[in-house]
């Protein structure tokens, strides 16, 4: 036990070892603040500020508002605070965790991700924002610095692998990676993993140094992902050509009669595989892979191949777009009537902007112009 300290501090709390048997042998009192205080008393230090963010009273006559979110902003997180958080989580209604500008120790970050995946919790929304620096040997190193790209590259590669692991295995519905400067290669891997992800509905990759290099992977992901509804790609380097390519991977595409014949042929082939797999399953033999087919639907005697109709919101603000993207945006709205897009106020000409302000237009209120 440390000499009692009035205020929480990272170094002494990080250096102390809260052993697992302390948690195993403790019988919770059912009062959040008292249970948290017990472990910090053992350390001999005040609780981390994150435990007080939402513990306020709206009315002196009423009970404190129950904690539903853990938010750690502009503060480091020691290993013992993480242990206490995950010990307390199953007995709370906390569903949201926000970690913003924390200068993580990579081992602490690994503990966080592994605990999210392996320990009981009800976390469905995670923000890991503006964390472009890691604390390495007592020094904060940026992912974009020369040292971050050379001497300490392994640390940042481990950080990225932890993010991939989270996307691949967790039950998260919302993930915010804003301002982490992850880069194209990381984004490509994230999009690849999202092809098979069936939980994440909202994703922010705002300000991640993304260029047109990773955009084909984003478009390809849209062909397979059927869960993502809202993506923030703001403050990157996507251009007009990216938007032109995007329209081919959203909504519906008209089919010719030949297309319909070919599609029906593939449906029969797929159904035959499914039928054969049922027998293989009974025989406990390996099943064959079932080919993926898009949905076909008919609208007013015209058949359409339906691609991604689930994505509803795209934020493209602070990207180097020009008025040339107008036709592509219109095509996206034609293919996806429920789509909503955000771009900068200065991207489109006044004439083109006005087309979205006409209440009689089908494009009215489909776009937000950020200032």
Which sequence ranges carry the predicted segments?
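Leucine-rich tandem repeat or coiled-coil scaffolds
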Residues: 1-371
């Amino acid at each position: 036990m440390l000499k009692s300290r009035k205020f929480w501090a990272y170094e002494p709390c990080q250096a102390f070892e809260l052993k697992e048997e302390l948690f195993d042998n403790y019988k919770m009192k059912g009062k959040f603040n008292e249970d948290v205080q017990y472990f910090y008393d053992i350390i001999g230090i005040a609780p981390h500020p994150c435990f007080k963010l939402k513990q306020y009273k709206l009315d002196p006559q009423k009970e404190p508002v129950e904690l539903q979110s853990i938010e750690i902003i502009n503060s480091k997180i020691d290993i013992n605070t993480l242990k206490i958080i995950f010990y307390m989580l199953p007995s709370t209604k906390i569903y949201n965790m926000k970690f913003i500008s924390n200068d993580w120790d990579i081992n602490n970050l690994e503990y966080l991700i592994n605990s999210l995946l392996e320990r009981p919790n009800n976390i469905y929304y995670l923000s890991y924002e503006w964390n472009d620096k890691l604390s390495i040997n007592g020094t904060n190193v940026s992912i974009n610095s020369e040292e971050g790209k050379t001497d300490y590259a392994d640390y940042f590669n481990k950080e990225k692998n932890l993010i991939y692991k989270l996307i691949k295995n967790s039950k998260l519905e919302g993930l915010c990676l804003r301002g982490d400067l992850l880069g194209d290669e990381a984004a490509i891997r994230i999009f690849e993993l999202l092809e098979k992800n069936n939980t994440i509905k909202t994703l922010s990759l705002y300000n991640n140094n993304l260029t047109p290099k990773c955009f084909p992977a984003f478009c390809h992901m849209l062909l397979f992902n059927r869960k993502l509804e809202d993506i923030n790609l703001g403050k990157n380097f996507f251009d007009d050509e990216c938007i032109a390519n995007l329209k081919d991977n959203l909504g519906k595409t008209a089919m010719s009669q030949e297309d319909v014949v070919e599609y029906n042929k593939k449906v029969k082939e797929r159904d035959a595989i499914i039928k054969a797999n049922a027998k293989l399953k009974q025989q406990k033999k390996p099943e064959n892979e079932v080919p993926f087919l898009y949905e076909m639907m008919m609208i007013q005697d015209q058949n359409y191949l339906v691609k991604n109709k689930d994505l509803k919101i795209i934020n493209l603000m602070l990207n180097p777009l020009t008025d040339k993207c107008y036709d592509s945006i219109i095509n996206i709205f034609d293919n996806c009537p429920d789509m909503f897009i955000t771009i900068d106020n200065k991207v489109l000409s006044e004439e083109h902007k006005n087309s979205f302000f006409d209440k009689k237009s089908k494009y009215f209120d489909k776009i937000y112009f950020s200032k």
